[in-house]
Amino acid sequence: MKRNIFIKLLISLLLLSSCTGDTCIDPDDFGFIKFNVSSRYNPEEITSRHEGDQVAPWRDSAYKVNGYPLTIMVRPWNYILGDKNTSGQLSAWCPWYGQKNNTTTLAPFCIKLQPCTFWDNTRLDMCTPNPENRNDAMISNPPCIMTDGVGLYFLIAAKNTDPNISPDSQRKPQGITRHLGELTSSVGYEFYSISSTGQLLKAGGINYQYNGEDKSKYAQSPLYFKIIDKFYDDNSGQYRLVIKSGVSDTRPDPLQFLTDLIKDVLFGKNGIIKKTYQQIVDTPGYRISVSAILTLYIMFTGLSFLIGNINLTHVELIIRIFKISIISILLSSDKAWTFFHDYLFVFFIDGVQQILQIINEAAATGPGSQSLLGLLISTQTLSKLFSLLFVDWLGFIYIILYLIALYFIFFLIFKATIIYLTALITIGMMIIMGPIFICFMLFNITRSLFENWLRQLISYALQPIILFAGIAFISMIIRTEIYSTLGFGVCKHDFPNLGPINEIFGSFLEDIDPSLSNSIFYWWFPVPMKGGINNFHKAKILVPNDHIVVDDSCKNNHDKCKHCAAYECIDERYIELPFLDLVKDSTRINNFINGKFVQLDGILLIFVSIYLLSKFNDTAISTAQFIAGTSGNLTDIQKVNQQSYESVSQQINRPLNYVAKTISTPVTSRISAGTAQANMFFAEKFENMMMRRLEKQALSSSANKVVQNEVKRKYGIDSKDVNMNAIKDYEDGISRLLNNLPKGNELKVKELSQMKFTQLRDKISANKYDVQDYTTLSTEQKTELDKLLKDANLRVLASDANFTKDYQEAYKHAHQEMSGRGIGLFGKNIGVLRSWQEMEHSINVKRKLKEEKRIGIGEKIYAGYTGIKRAALTTIVGKDLRDAYEGNLTSAEWHDFEYNDPRLRTYSEKLKDDEKAREREKLRMHINKETLAVQADILSPEYLVKLEKAGRKSDVEYYQELAQRQLIYDVHSKLFEEGEPVMMGDRFMREKATDSQMRDMIDNAHKKYVELIDVDRYTRRQEYYDIIYEKAKENLEQTYKEVQDHFKRDNISIEEMPALIAQKVKDTNAGSEIDKKITEELNNFNADVKNYEYSTAVLNKIEDRKQTITDVVNVQIDKINKYRENAKMEQYVKPILNEGRKLRTLEDHFKNMK
């Protein structure tokens, strides 16, 4: 029986290999998408019938791009070399002499014409879809035929757009348009293809790689093609296209078709699962039962609370309300399915499908079907396989082994598919039972039933994921071997040659299969058929499979090596063996060159992979069950482990404890101190390593999106506004500048890049002119240096780099803050869990503040009582005698100095400051709550300006008041921080502070003021908005002066400017593009106005913030001077002056220019 099945399989595969329709198959072709694009259209498709002004629709390829490099090759065609003028071989078109029947063939006159050449020796911008380009192509040898993709364009249409909706959209569609006829040699590679006669020829095509956000923006967008001409009625011919990568393959996979069919029956819009679920929920008996259960649960909860049987904490209350809300939804027949499907069941249905799709895409490391089975049985793969039969005596053995391997792989994948379908059906059955088991979560006695139900759902969802993850891993190994062993070209060779058959039957056989034009008997043979180094040619080509580029920059650290997707990177390889690296695969290359096409080591690795796959299939289910069931037994396992560990550790520690007791105290102290120091050293190293990792992560594509949203919400920095390469650009700019300085090599780029722009300017001044700083330069030197720095664009680069560094710091702080609130690795990526942990953290903080306040009130009352006792004793016995006996009479610890306190406050003073700290924490929590509500940084100048623009004056005043209070608290924290506080405790300042100490405090206040301005995340943005302001101001002044000079007027208002600009353009320009010029000028003017007004408003807000910092610091300086005055010391008045400015509105600025 098995032998009959094997024979049938062999015959089927032999027949399948003859269905390719191609005379030759390229080395990297394992099932490419191929279709034709005709140069002719039906008359009703043409929009304009006037000669020289026809517009044709774009041809829909029926495929969508997937974001990977889009690689399209145009087949070569040459009639002189033997290619035929048939629909199966023709890949050229002619703009002359065509008839209606020349849709897929050339007109007889055009067959023997030469390919077109061009006067400018280039094909750039030829016949672009831009309606403004009405120039003909610069053809030097008309009439001729177009080949290699000349005149053919592809279009990646923007989502939700139709390029054929109107003639204008056909001329100028929305999306990405590229010409396939450009010379690929200009970008460093060539396309090669095997012609129908077996010759390796250069081909046309394009390799388009997306820029920046275009990859995600255009993913799953439709792909169109069109040969662009101005008159289509006399065209003839077509292009044959081969899409090598970059599109989602929609060709049906048998097993995938079966899976989708069953999934649609079960979970479709009118699927069995949904109908059955709704029938259960709509049953009156079920609704009555759920209502009764909810009533009982609420009654038991209230009764248990009244008799003190349960302690309803905030968390417990929220949990119970959450349960009641969930169960109540089951009573709503309209919302029951929608709610539970969208928020729970979708993870087990669509979530699993999405994960499997990601796994399959990751496993598809090269051309051909994403499915391993589809790759192995593709006609191209089988054709290459059977070509081995007559070139090597081992070919027959290899074919038999391959078919045996294919037999096992088919049944293993079929088994995996059955497991997946079984899991899907089981998940569906458990979802049907969901309305029953969800109710079981209410009571402790039934909660285990709900948990087991949920655990089983997770188990059956994990089974296909784990199973197909293993299959994907093994398939990557098998794919690599298939590409390496069968990655060569093949062609059909006829025997015997029946040339006259084509003359007898015409083109009938050619329409069925082009290769039947000469003979109905043929076989596949490799290209080249024989070995020899002369038959193999090296060239720069696109590497057709995923690989890692190992160069000198990453030899020692492969993690830094670049990973290239299929057809993304260029490398020098043999054209006939594009999958083999010249260095790593030199052994196999030598085998091919020596005529040994059969690689038995590859088939051996495939069998090893099959064996691993069979073992993995058997363990995948048990692995999923173990993962899903671990949580239920984790506590017991931990208890057993802990008990066994304690009994063993006690026996081990006995002699150690005895020895430790005999060691003297100084020795143990030194050991403890050394251990602590070592721990601190490693902890510091680890923390620094983690911080550096977070800094790199913040600027990489792997940055955590949730942390980025937290940065945007709390710090007002959107990752989209950050130039991820700004720091490197700034360093490169400094490096270029230093190369132009005579003594530039004395300065270090890294050190300079950490400085502010003004500090950098001082360093450059000192290096170039041997002066102290920029202020000591002469006027000529300043002018020269300013021009040098402006040409280097260092100010803008420094501003961008500082903004990027601020983003890195905010990312680190946001990550640490989220971790500090109990939000771990999983919580950062799961919205519900993150909100729950945030809520729990907020409750804990409020509870802690409440407890601290209660203790503080008690201590404050007692401190007041002891203060009254102390004042009474001072009145009776005097200050000196009081100080002598204070320790025994008045609880002096409340009013004496805390010598462990850096500010030497009394305990009573410390209590007052602690109360202020609690107020600050409450304010911080309130601001965080407001920030969460609006999902924006409410304290940022940018947000306040946006509110003012929107006319929300009351909100602006409210948020400004919060910002003012928060800023005052922040300034106080900076001034009174440990180390060098600006002011000590009140009693110390009155009784102990010396003249020099107070002078140092005032000087320290000035130093901390500078630090406050430098580190404040909002004032640091001043340089960024200064640049925007100055650029907009310069542009507006120039525009105003041009309009002023043109109309000879001085009293021009801002309202008149748009009309005057438009009139000025009309007066000074002529031609068809005048409307476009007017629009461009007005857009530039409006953009400058917008930038000026926005930057002015933000800068004024920043100045207000700086003034607040100045005022708060000056208040502290005044207090110190007051203490000095009371102590009869000399005045040391040294207030801080904020040299800020208030910027004028645009209207006032225009008036000032008149």
UniProtKB/Swiss-Prot annotation:
Residues with a covalently attached lipid (N-palmitoyl cysteine): 19
Record's bilayer topology term: Multi-pass membrane protein; Lipid-anchor
Subcellular localization: Cell membrane
Matching PROSITE patterns: PROKAR_LIPOPROTEIN
Protein's UniProt keywords contain Transmembrane helix: yes
Signal peptide: 1-18
Chain segments annotated as transmembrane: 288-308, 394-414, 423-443, 458-478
Pfam families given in the database record: TrbL (PF04610)
Protein name in the entry: Uncharacterized lipoprotein RT0028
Organism the protein comes from: Rickettsia typhi (strain ATCC VR-144 / Wilmington)
